[in-house]
Amino acid sequence: MSRISADDVRKVAKLARLDLPEEKIATYTGQLESILEYVGQLESIDTEGVPETTRAVEVTNVTREDGVTPTPVREDILNQAPQREGDFFRVPKILAD
């Protein structure tokens, strides 16, 4: 498998829209190289006769019947809020102007 260069890491970071500090490039280069070496090892495993799957353990969703439930009265819900303004909840500002 070919060696991963610092330029390869910069390119992957750019494609992933990651802003990597220059001092971390060498670290990530080594880590990416290790990951790709491991993938190379996985490629050598004989999977002849093994059925394709998307997960190692079969999972089944547990569902329930849909049912109609009463909707709480809007006024009761609004009255539980610490602050309200008319028919709306009043919440602290979280975005700058």
UniProtKB/Swiss-Prot annotation:
<keyword id="KW-0648">Protein biosynthesis</keyword>
<comment type="subunit">
    <text>Heterotrimer of A, B and C subunits.</text>
</comment>
<dbReference type="GO" id="GO:0005524">
    <property type="term" value="F:ATP binding"/>
</dbReference>
<keyword id="KW-0436">Ligase</keyword>
<dbReference type="GO" id="GO:0006450">
    <property type="term" value="P:regulation of translational fidelity"/>
</dbReference>
<dbReference type="GO" id="GO:0050567">
    <property type="term" value="F:glutaminyl-tRNA synthase (glutamine-hydrolyzing) activity"/>
</dbReference>
<dbReference type="Pfam" id="PF02686">
    <property type="entry name" value="GatC"/>
</dbReference>
<dbReference type="InterPro" id="IPR003837">
    <property type="entry name" value="GatC"/>
</dbReference>
<dbReference type="GO" id="GO:0050566">
    <property type="term" value="F:asparaginyl-tRNA synthase (glutamine-hydrolyzing) activity"/>
</dbReference>
<protein>
    <recommendedName>
        <fullName>Aspartyl/glutamyl-tRNA(Asn/Gln) amidotransferase subunit C</fullName>
        <ecNumber>6.3.5.-</ecNumber>
    </recommendedName>
</protein>
<dbReference type="GO" id="GO:0006412">
    <property type="term" value="P:translation"/>
</dbReference>
<dbReference type="GO" id="GO:0070681">
    <property type="term" value="P:glutaminyl-tRNAGln biosynthesis via transamidation"/>
</dbReference>
<comment type="function">
    <text>Allows the formation of correctly charged Asn-tRNA(Asn) or Gln-tRNA(Gln) through the transamidation of misacylated Asp-tRNA(Asn) or Glu-tRNA(Gln) in organisms which lack either or both of asparaginyl-tRNA or glutaminyl-tRNA synthetases. The reaction takes place in the presence of glutamine and ATP through an activated phospho-Asp-tRNA(Asn) or phospho-Glu-tRNA(Gln).</text>
</comment>
<dbReference type="InterPro" id="IPR036113">
    <property type="entry name" value="Asp/Glu-ADT_sf_sub_c"/>
</dbReference>
<keyword id="KW-0547">Nucleotide-binding</keyword>
<keyword id="KW-0067">ATP-binding</keyword>
<comment type="similarity">
    <text>Belongs to the GatC family.</text>
</comment>
